[in-house]
């Protein structure tokens, strides 16, 4: 049975334009061992904001039971979440969903991690786990602008890291695909998370390879009951086969679902 826990905020700060890093501690953090999973956060106990907010897991410190969450404060709920201070508690449901398959890559092989915007955070925990497994990691991160970018130094400590910004204020001007076109990157497995247009480009480029995408989607319940986050299965002409992003995903092999 999925359970919730009121976790205590140990650190909460803005790390980029509209991007916040929140660290919390709780007993259930020890169960959050699969990179790519997410948690559902209840912003407050009032009746005004009923739905929980899905936030991807950025990092887990198993020794201290500390969970790191990165999110963009853009809606009413996340803006209110951004006002919470150290010492306060937040109601968290999780871990939820299916994470990135670590078994898809062997020790000594190279993983290519491709992230865009708020799809970057879950790749950090993935990169750390891959590094601990003995894999090599290459990171390609995309942002709108330098002021929106974050965690470059953290990713760089784990492997070669490239950055692309739409306005050219940091790294390569353009999208992550521009970096992929310019650099002769050698890899064995691809893991990606980001906005749908980026995932479409990644899927078209790496179809038929060992490649996996994590989808960003608004979710109602987070446990597969409300059917608010379904996506169709590739090749289903009748359109009756689907996957629930919250429980079957958010991670899928490239080509399995329609983007």
From Swiss-Prot:
Positions with a binding annotation for FAD: 53-56, 70-72, 77-78
Gene Ontology MF: a single term: flavin adenine dinucleotide binding
Keyword presence, Flavoprotein: yes
Coiled coil: none
Residues that hold [2Fe-2S] cluster according to the record: 221, 226, 229, 246
Domain FAD-binding FR-type: start-end pairs: 2-102
Record keywords: 2Fe-2S, Electron transport, FAD, Flavoprotein, Iron, Iron-sulfur, Metal-binding, Pyrimidine biosynthesis, Transport
Cofactor(s), by name: [2Fe-2S] cluster; FAD
Involved pathway(s): Pyrimidine metabolism; UMP biosynthesis via de novo pathway; orotate from (S)-dihydroorotate (NAD(+) route): step 1/1
Statement: the UniProt record of this protein carries the keyword Metal-binding: yes
GO biological process, one term: 'de novo' UMP biosynthetic process
Family note: Belongs to the PyrK family.
Function per UniProt: Responsible for channeling the electrons from the oxidation of dihydroorotate from the FMN redox center in the PyrD type B subunit to the ultimate electron acceptor NAD(+).
The protein's assembly and partners: Heterotetramer of 2 PyrK and 2 PyrD type B subunits.
The protein's name: Dihydroorotate dehydrogenase B (NAD(+)), electron transfer subunit
Organism listed in the record: Halalkalibacterium halodurans (strain ATCC BAA-125 / DSM 18197 / FERM 7344 / JCM 9153 / C-125) (Bacillus halodurans)
